[in-house]
Amino acid sequence: MSNTLFEPSVGNKIFNQIAAKEKKLEIIHGYYVTSILKEGNSVKGATFKNDKNETLEVHAKITIDATDIGETLKMAGAAYRLGMDSQKETKEANAPLKANNIVQDLTWVAILKDYGKGTDKTIAKPSNYSASNFTGSCMETVDHKEIDCDKMLSYGKMPNNKYMINWPKKGNDVYLDVVELSREDRNKELLKARNYTLQFVYYIQNELGYKNLGLADDEFDTSDLLAYAPYYREGRRVKGVSFLTYNHVADPYNQKEALYKTGISVGDYPVDHHHKQNPNAPDLGFPAVPSYNVPLGSLIPEKVDGFIVSDKAISASNLINGATRLQPVVLLTGQAAGTLAGVAIKNNIEPRKVSVREVQQSLLNQKAYIMPLYDVKPTDPAFEAIQKITATGILKTKGESYKWANRTWFYPEQNITVQEFTEGLNQFDKKNKIVKSSVLLTEQEAVNILTKAGAKFPKENLSAKPISKRNLAILIEESLHAFEKEIDFSGNIKTKK
C-alpha cells in the first residue's frame, strides 16, 4: 500500500496546481447535487445546494457522475445494478447463484501523526467503545502469517511520520446499507462509521500503547480531524453500453466481446472484497486476475444521453468492481471520462456515437495507457505503437497474477513464429490466411505477409534475421494502420454501410 500513498494535503495541492493551469475551468466547492436536469432522454445539467441553502443550476452538453456511489444515476433515470450479481447474469463462476443487495464494507479513514516519543495524544473514549471489537487486528494469524502491530500501522504509512488508518481485519471497516438512503438519512448513518474509526484510534492508543500517534492536525479541518468523506468501496453501478465482468479480465482473448480492444484506463489491483463486518455476506473468494483495462463502453449508460459515468459507478460486475474500484484506476477512468466528453462535444455528438479509436488516440496523446503493459513504459519510443497494436489484438500479451500488483507482459525483445503472427492477423481480419509454421518470423517474411494483407512498403534491404516484437509492432503500425480501422464498443471492426 505505501508505494502509492501520499498525504491528502499534498495530493490536494498537486490537483489544485494541475487545475489552476486550465484557464477555462471553474471549480466550485461546498455544493451537493439535488437534481438532474433533463429534456426527454437527455441530461442537460444539474442543480446543487450548499449548507447555507444557496442553490446553483449548471447547464451542460455533457454531465459526468464521478461520485463514489453513483449518486445521480437514479436522478438521471439511468438503469443500474446494486449489490452482488448472480452467476446467471454475469457467467462468473465466483458470483453467487442468487443476486442480493449486499455491498462492500466502507471505511471512514483517519490520518495519524507521530508527535514524538513521550507525548500522549490519546483521544477521549468514544461512545459505545468496546476493545473486543478490535481484538485480533494485529498479532493474529492472517493467511498463516503473523501480522504484528507495527506492520499493521506501516501498511498505510505515509511520508512525514503519518499513517493512514484503513485496516480491514478487526479494524475500522464497517457495513452500512446507505446507498439508497436520502442524503440526510445517509449522513446520520455515516456518523456510526466516524465513531467506529475513532474507537479504533482509541484502541490503537489506549490498548496497543501508541499514545504518541494522534490524529493529524494538518490534514483535514473537520471537527473530529477525520477525512471529509467515507471511503465507499461500492455503490450503484450503471447498466452501460459495455458490461465488464471478471471473465473479460481473467481471459480477455476468449470472450464474446473483445472489450480489451476498447480500453481507456488500466489497473493492476486484484479482486478484493471487504465483507468481514457483514455476517450475511457470502464468501466470493479472491479469484486471481492479471492487470487489465476498463472498456470505454462501461462509462456510457445504455439509454440515457448527455451523461457519462466514472469512478466506481461504471458498468462493471460486482465481482470485478473489487479490482476496478481502486483509486489509481478511478483516477485514470476519470481522465478518460473527461476525454470522452471532450471528444463528444468537439464532434457535436452523443458519447455513444464517438469513435472508440479517437478517444483512445486522445488518451495516447496524453501518454495515458489504454493497454496495461508492465514492460513498456510511456518513455519508450515504441510505447504508442505497441499500445495501438496490442489494442488491435494482432500481437498478444501475457497476463500474470502477481501478489497485490498484477502484470501484463508484452515481451518487446522476444520473437514470435510465423504462425503466431498470421494467427493474429487472421483474428484481426479473416481474409488473412494462417500459415502453420514454427519458424521464427523475420523482417523479410513479416513484410511479405503484411504486403498480402494490404500494406505497402518502399523497396528496401530487409533483414533475414528474426524480428523483435517491438520492431514488429512499429512495422505493423506504420504500414497496415490497423489501429485506424474503426471498432464498436465490443471491439468488432465496423463495416461500411
Per-range role (PLM):
Residues 4-8, 12, 66, 186, ...:
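Solvent-exposed, acidic/flexible segments
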Residues 29-30, 40-45, 49-62, 66-362:
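Flavin (FAD/FMN)-binding glycine-rich loop and adjacent Rossmann-like elements that form
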Residues 24, 347, 351-372, 378-396:
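Catalytic cores of secreted or luminal carbohydrate-active enzymes
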Residues 2-5, 59, 183-190, 320-324, ...:
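Second-shell loop/turn segments in exported
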